[in-house]
Amino acid sequence: MVTTHNLGFPRIGAKRELKFGLERYWKGESSRDELKALGAELRRRHWHDQRDLDLAPIGDFAFYDQVLDMSFTLGNLPKRVQDFHGDALDNYFRVARGRSAQSAEEHAACCGGVAAGEMTKWFDTNYHYIVPEFHADTNFSLDPSRLLQQLAEANAQGVNAKPVILGPVTYLWLGKAKDDSDRLALLPKLLPVYGALLDTLTAQGVEWVQIDEPILVTELDAEWRQAFRIAYAALETRRIKLLLATYFGQLQDNLTLAASLPVDGLHIDAINARDEVDALVRELPAERVLSVGAINGRNIWKTDLNAALDWLEPLAKQLGDRLWLAPSCSLLHVPVDLASEEKLDAEIRSWLAFALQKLDELKVLATALNEGRDKVADALAANAAAIDSRRRSPRVNNPAVKAAIARIDARLGNRTSPYTQRASKQSARLNLPAFPTTTIGSFPQTAEIRQARSRFKAGALDEAGYRKAMQAEIERSVREQESLELDVLVHGEAERNDMVEYFGEQLDGYAFSQFGWVQSYGSRCVKPPILFGDISRPKAMTVEWIAYAQSLTRKPMKGMLTGPVTILNWSFVRDDQPRAVSCYQLALAIREEVLDLEKAGVRVIQIDEAALREGLPLRRAQWSEYLKWAVESFRITANGVQDDTQIHTHMCYSEFNDIIASIADMDADVITIETSRSDMELLDAFDTFKYPNEIGPGVYDIHSPNIPTQDHIVGLMRKAAERIPAERLWVNPDCGLKTRQWAEVIPALTNMVAAAKMLRNQVQ
């Protein structure tokens, strides 16, 4: 019999209950006990949703991040919070979010009382994790309370529980040494704590533990490979069964290593590594379980179940009880329930599967393998009809778009003149001071903005009323920026629900959901639009709003667009053509918007590519192909304008030291980047690479409520000036200010502008 299980379930709730619960708690509007009760209720509901599985995950629920949870389980707390003796949950949030100082003395140590932990992308997804911090003298100590609490809840509910933990080698690999120490040198101290954790779970009657080691799908040197052998030899003596889980890619040169580790089962991502199944069957010891991720855990398209059974049936005959079935990875990366999508186009809806529907697909596959296809004939027929409908739909294929793609040539991606000539023309037109100040685009999405949007969508506010409300918010943003004496202004994006969904709603070839939310980090959720067909732009999307904002001020107003690579990487993308083709289609559509903004008199146009690095394949050998079409797509978008129109781009969480040449090749006049959480570490790339254009290193972390001091910002900019000529530096926050409150934004930007003025005086 085939065993079914799941690697993880979305934790936010079908209606984002966790997000709203967290925000109430952080604002002091609910108690700690109420938040913990909400967590328990979500876990209860999610285990009920997974009741048909043979094994359901526990430990996948986190109030902020599963990697941060593992740090607390291992007793690896940053030194700056180790002396805090209050509630563990509050300490947890101190690491996740930081805490502003209450006094000048606290400010002296940092930009606030407690600095937030560094946050970065979880492999090549749009989820972010809190980076574990290590020092040469780091010690570990077991705190299993979180897992034991969830295990007790699951047992009481009758769940056949499979605890999920992050493996020791991946945990070290994901972290960062805060001194010059070697992370792997900590492995001997870490392994006994893992052993104690497994012993603790064994004592609770747990049979299987899922231990995630996704770095096995990346390129590993000999030292890291040896770390796997050492780690699992040490854990082999435990009496508990280990399912080693890999996902997000192929094992490739790590296949033999993964197959040889002394564990009881191996999970692979059979969406990406389907070609490796036969080799694994040959290499795995005869008694070992092979779990195949046959349902895509990262996209929302229905699985072709009949096609999946065509290759699973021979495998089931070969492996028998040793075959397990699961999604390819945790379902954290997809929305919860398609059944909520009552307003989604019925035809498009028939092509989709969210987390609950993927579990239904898993059940159909397992039933067909265990009892024969006839047992689920109706479900298989319905699935086949949906797959065929999508394949044949004229809504998916637009001949005019395909013809435009065929006409793309190199000239489309080139500016008229090189940067040095453009810079002088832009300087004359914009007349900006040294260290010009700007923000990245969005200002706080206030309750009034959200209420107006909600009323408009519900039909309670007409279009004229909605436009008036948004114009009032735009005017407020402009007046605040003028009062702050910022140099290049933004309109604040009051009218935008999301930097990608806003555009997806206005492009042909896109559909959008009501409740298709996925977690990005903490309480931050995004609702990726659904790219189902060929992309085109029926009409201008932003010109009216930007032109109105520009009419309110004589200062330059940035046109704000999301770039094609980011729209692609933050969408649920069609899987029936190469991603590069979809990206070129987006580039042509956004290019039309860029040219319309320029015609409307907009002098500065920002094209955000926040997710450029996110699309990089996990293996470096595959980078060049991705970067080629990603950079080409940006250049097609940006390079139709005149020399005196200044093109900006923004990248967040982009550890781009290793792709700096490609970023330079994008040829944006100004790039703004996230650097504050890494203390300008991202600028190390400029020690050896002479970036030719202008750059704005982010000077304060907008993901934390901390208010940076003027001196702190000046210090960061001085570090930047050691690498970038002062005349090419801008001063700006790390990212957009949408998630902050005006009470936080005004003092932070006041200090930022004051810092820029101080720098100008020092330069003069």
Curated annotation (Swiss-Prot):
Binding site for 5-methyltetrahydropteroyltri-L-glutamate: 16-19, 121, 524-525, 570, 614
Annotated coiled-coil segments of the chain: none
Gene3D superfamilies reported in the protein's UniProt record: 3.20.20.210
Active-site residue list: 703 (proton donor)
Positions contributing to L-methionine binding: 440-442, 493, 608
Record Pfam families: Meth_synt_1 (PF08267), Meth_synt_2 (PF01717)
Pathway named in the protein's UniProt entry: Amino-acid biosynthesis; L-methionine biosynthesis via de novo pathway; L-methionine from L-homocysteine (MetE route): step 1/1
Record-listed Zn(2+) binding positions: 650, 652, 674, 735
Disulfide bonds: none
Keyword Metal-binding: yes
Binding site for L-homocysteine: 440-442, 493, 608
GO molecular function, one term: zinc ion binding
Co-factor remark: Binds 1 zinc ion per subunit.
Reactions the enzyme catalyzes: 5-methyltetrahydropteroyltri-L-glutamate + L-homocysteine = tetrahydropteroyltri-L-glutamate + L-methionine
InterPro entries for this protein: Cbl-indep_Met_Synth_N, Cobalamin-indep_Met_synthase, Met_Synth_C/arc, UROD/MetE-like_sf
Entry similarity comment: Belongs to the vitamin-B12 independent methionine synthase family.
Function, as annotated: Catalyzes the transfer of a methyl group from 5-methyltetrahydrofolate to homocysteine resulting in methionine formation.
NCBIfam families: met_syn_B12ind, PRK05222.1
Name under which the protein is recorded: 5-methyltetrahydropteroyltriglutamate--homocysteine methyltransferase
Organism: Burkholderia orbicola (strain MC0-3)
